[in-house]
């Protein structure tokens, strides 16, 4: 082994020993720093300089303090307005806030209009319902001593009728009809021409509502339910002649359905799924049961039949249209 090899071997051994030396740890109140002294050894051999590798010190910094979700949320909420004030200015921020409130209230008012009120009666319609209830109470001879009680019994029925789309308020027409009734009949009662006309208009509106398939599908069912409650155990105070005319109109309508509905079902059975045609047949059975009641028992109609009718849902649109056309034709012929 020559001198150069001996020197190189010594340098390698020295470098290995330096790497294995223990590190010195210095502790302060804030940070802990671990360093390894940088040792530089210079050995001159035949004018050659050898410098061992240097180990760089590492610094272990403590992690920043963590904030919980609640702390961050509170910080954001508390500082948000201050940040907006600095960016926009306090006056601009106030104007924006006032503008937001104005637009918000405007949207709320627009959504509360009758057209966007989910089909519910507006405040104006509710007032008209009260007025109509008073007129109906007078027309039907309702008094505090009658079985019907006060006119509040009419209001749920009228409100449901409004929801179903079957009641249009026209004060001029209503007042004219009321005045004509008073002229034609000094006693309290319903003028049959006006009554039939109103029923016809109501049927048309109900059919249109059903054919449009609006979101208020429960409106007609609720209408039947309230009509059932109104009729249950109540005796309308009507003049004998007028009572007979109203009963005749009711019986003719039921008779038409009992006679024509089964044939219509058979002709259109292929146009509907089996579960629908089964529902139609159940409806037809109810109409037949009502039609078979003895004459003079219309005012004692079993409310359970009306409840079952309500549960079975609406009549088919095309059958309703045929029924309405027939009723309108009969009214035109009478006029």
Curated annotation (Swiss-Prot):
GO terms for cellular component: peroxisomal membrane. Residues 22-55, 109-119 have a biased composition (Low complexity). InterPro entries: Pex19 (IPR006708), Pex19_C_sf (IPR038322). GO terms for biological process: protein import into peroxisome membrane; protein targeting to peroxisome. Keywords: Peroxisome. Gene3D superfamilies: Pex19, mPTS binding domain. It comes from the Eukaryota. Pfam families: Pex19. Its main location: other. Residues 14-70, 104-124 are annotated as: Disordered. It is found in: Peroxisome. Signal peptide: none annotated. GO terms for molecular function: peroxisome membrane targeting sequence binding. Belongs to the peroxin-19 family. PANTHER family: PEROXISOMAL BIOGENESIS FACTOR 19 (PTHR12774:SF2). This is Putative peroxisomal biogenesis factor 19. It comes from Dictyostelium discoideum. The lineage of its organism: Eukaryota, Amoebozoa, Evosea, Eumycetozoa, Dictyostelia.
